[in-house]
Amino acid sequence: MERSHVGRDCGSRSSPRAFSVPTSNVPMKMSIPFRPKQSLGQNFLHDPNMAEKIVGTLTAPPEAHVVEVGAGTGVLTERLAERHDRLTALEIDERAVEVLRERVPEADVRETDVRETDWAALADEKGGPLRVISNTPYYLTSPILFALLGQRDCLAEAVLTMQKEVAERIVAEPSTKAYGILSVLLQLFAEPTLCFTVPPQVFSPQPDVTSAVVRIRFGPDTEPEDLHFDDARRYVRAAFNQRRKMLRNSLSAWTKEQDVGFPNDWGRKRAEALTPDEFATLARHLDAHADPVPDA
């Protein structure tokens, strides 16, 4: 089953209005009302056309509840508020919170650290499932992805702008250098699509890397049967933490030390050789035949 895509199915279904992309190589700019903090990983989007394109990637219907993570100066927030009556903006910087509450008064703006967000509680409060959108601070991309995966039952969709290298890892195929933990877990428990790249010039300050927008769909049809996320994550992490070793060595705590064999002679393969579906089969096998091993 194909569970990841590159550059496919990324058109907007949330609004009939089309966005325009500037033909000039010099993007339009919107003013930044305060100095970005490097400690918060702030690179503010200032191009209105790119903002329209990113917001247009969200497939949420008008009645859906949308949560923006790291709303910053409100470039996405304003456009989201035009499309959705129920909008929550999470922001850790008190300066940005003040700007957001003035600029987008109809949004529920909350001063909070996204790493402390209880997505299930927020979904219950707002009548979920939630749709998440974010120009993600690069240093928070992985924590946010794992947090969303861990609480995916209350989510329907996420549209995240991130470093292009990370986006490519998410949709990577087996037996490639980019294929790893994020690839397996996101392709197993969700449906990620790499939609388009975002040049550094549309941010202020300008980052040193190119970004990309990834849309991640969650739902019952993306859930593997009889497989618990925490168990799968434990096996996948152990396998890729020693990716140059054969699985019989990297997973020896569940196999060799417990006299448990591998299906299909997979013990002779490296982690990068197994597809996400094969990892699911292996995880079910270890769940059935091996005792749990505490996290290191």
UniProtKB/Swiss-Prot annotation:
One of its GO terms (cellular component) is cytoplasm. Residues 1-24 are annotated as: Disordered. It catalyses: adenosine(1518)/adenosine(1519) in 16S rRNA + 4 S-adenosyl-L-methionine = N(6)-dimethyladenosine(1518)/N(6)-dimethyladenosine(1519) in 16S rRNA + 4 S-adenosyl-L-homocysteine + 4 H(+). The gene is rsmA. Belongs to the class I-like SAM-binding methyltransferase superfamily. rRNA adenine N(6)-methyltransferase family. RsmA subfamily. It is found in: Cytoplasm. The lineage of its organism: Bacteria, Pseudomonadati, Rhodothermota, Rhodothermia, Rhodothermales. Keywords: Cytoplasm, Methyltransferase, RNA-binding, rRNA processing, S-adenosyl-L-methionine, Transferase. InterPro entries: KsgA/Erm (IPR001737), rRNA_Ade_diMease-like_C (IPR023165), rRNA_Ade_Mease_Trfase_CS (IPR020596), rRNA_Ade_methylase_Trfase_N (IPR020598), rRNA_adenine_dimethylase (IPR011530), SAM-dependent_MTases_sf (IPR029063). HAMAP family: 16SrRNA_methyltr_A. It is an enzyme of class 2 (transferase). This is Ribosomal RNA small subunit methyltransferase A. The keyword Transferase applies. Specifically dimethylates two adjacent adenosines (A1518 and A1519) in the loop of a conserved hairpin near the 3'-end of 16S rRNA in the 30S particle. May play a critical role in biogenesis of 30S subunits. Its EC number is 2.1.1.182. S-adenosyl-L-methionine binds at residues 43, 45, 70, 91, 113, 135. NCBIfam families: ksgA. It comes from the Bacteria. Residues 1-11 have a biased composition (Basic and acidic residues). Coiled coil: none annotated. The keyword Lyase does not apply. One of its GO terms (molecular function) is 16S rRNA (adenine(1518)-N(6)/adenine(1519)-N(6))-dimethyltransferase activity. Residues 12-24 have a biased composition (Polar residues).
